């Protein structure tokens, strides 16, 4: 009689982590950063129909990389959760911190109890009444909440090069156009440094949205078309070392 194969719990966790990390690394990058007027989302995304950046609630936005079907189920679940909380209590009681904790618990349960972990990394952002109240939460595949950089979040492909570029170029209280140029330049960093990044930063391949502090009511707004073109860095800047633009998300499976 053949003996069943045995794998230690430590080995299972390592293999699940490796699977999730590889899936996330294949995804196109997303940058989320604070600027003077709120929070800016810039995602590499050539698909006009599948979104990596979305609204969750009045002041809360969502961005993700990895397997689309998995982070889309998280997005929908998050919307249902905050809608219920706002209905039962008060819309002002809904906040990004509580939602991030719910996502952390969900991802942790999936990672430890299911055969396959979610190949996703997500960011939950909330715009406050002033810049000091803006919040960014990055959640990894195992439910860990990472807040190593309070001013910006990078997810997906070549995060090291993009993070390094943002540390060089990011500054507080940037205007929207400046913040967009900084994000685009950072997304181009892997290709300019010789790393195998996608480097797709033309306006048609970027998904750009903001949480606009001054907007009445719901703060989330997408930036597309002529408005995006007018905010983009000049063409000579995009083709030079400081290049950049945003792009849209959604390669079907791995985003």
Swiss-Prot record:
Comp. bias (Basic and acidic residues): 202-217
Residues in coiled coil: none
Known role: Component of the proteasome core, a large protease complex with broad specificity involved in protein degradation.
Cellular compartments annotated: Cytoplasm
High-level lineage: Bacteria, Bacillati, Actinomycetota, Actinomycetes, Pseudonocardiales
Protein name, entry field: Proteasome subunit alpha
Record GO terms (molecular function): threonine-type endopeptidase activity
Pfam families: Proteasome
Cytoplasm among keywords: yes
Annotated Polar residues bias: 190-201
Oligomeric form and interacting partners: The 20S proteasome core is composed of 14 alpha and 14 beta subunits that assemble into four stacked heptameric rings, resulting in a barrel-shaped structure. The two inner rings, each composed of seven catalytic beta subunits, are sandwiched by two outer rings, each composed of seven alpha subunits. The catalytic chamber with the active sites is on the inside of the barrel. Has a gated structure, the ends of the cylinder being occluded by the N-termini of the alpha-subunits. Is capped by the proteasome-associated ATPase, ARC.
Keywords: Cytoplasm, Proteasome
Pathway(s): Protein degradation; proteasomal Pup-dependent pathway
UniProt record, GO biological process: modification-dependent protein catabolic process; proteasomal protein catabolic process
GO CC annotations, alphabetized: cytoplasm; proteasome core complex, alpha-subunit complex
Family statement drawn from the similarity comment of this UniProt entry: Belongs to the peptidase T1A family.
Regulation: The formation of the proteasomal ATPase ARC-20S proteasome complex, likely via the docking of the C-termini of ARC into the intersubunit pockets in the alpha-rings, may trigger opening of the gate for substrate entry. Interconversion between the open-gate and close-gate conformations leads to a dynamic regulation of the 20S proteasome proteolysis activity.
């Amino acid at each position: 009689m053949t003996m069943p194969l045995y794998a230690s719990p430590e080995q299972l966790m390592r293999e699940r982590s490796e699977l999730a990390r590889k899936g996330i690394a294949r995804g196109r990058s997303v940058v989320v950063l604070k600027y003077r007027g709120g929070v800016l989302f810039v995602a590499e995304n050539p698909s006009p129909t599948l979104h990596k950046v979305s609204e969750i609630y009045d002041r809360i936005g969502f961005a993700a990389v990895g397997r689309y079907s998995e982070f889309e189920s998280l997005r929908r679940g998050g919307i249902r959760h905050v809608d219920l909380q706002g209905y039962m209590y008060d819309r002002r009681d809904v906040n990004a911190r509580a939602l991030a904790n719910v996502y952390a618990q969900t991802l942790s349960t999936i990672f430890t109890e299911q055969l396959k972990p979610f190949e996703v990394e997500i960011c939950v952002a909330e715009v406050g009444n002033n810049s000091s109240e803006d919040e960014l939460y990055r959640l990894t595949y195992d439910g860990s909440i990472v807040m190593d950089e309070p001013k910006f979040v990078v997810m997906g492909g070549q995060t090291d090069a993009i993070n390094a570029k943002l540390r060089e170029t990011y500054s507080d209280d940037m205007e929207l156009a400046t913040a967009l140029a900084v994000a685009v330049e950072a997304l181009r960093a892997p290709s300019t440094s010789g790393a195998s990044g996608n480097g797709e930063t033309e306006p048609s391949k970027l998904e750009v949205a903001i949480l606009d502090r001054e907007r009445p009511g719901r703060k989330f707004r997408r930036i597309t078309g002529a408005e995006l073109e007018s905010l983009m860095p000049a063409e000579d800047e995009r083709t030079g070392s400081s290049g950049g633009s945003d792009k849209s998300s959604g390669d079907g499976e791995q985003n």
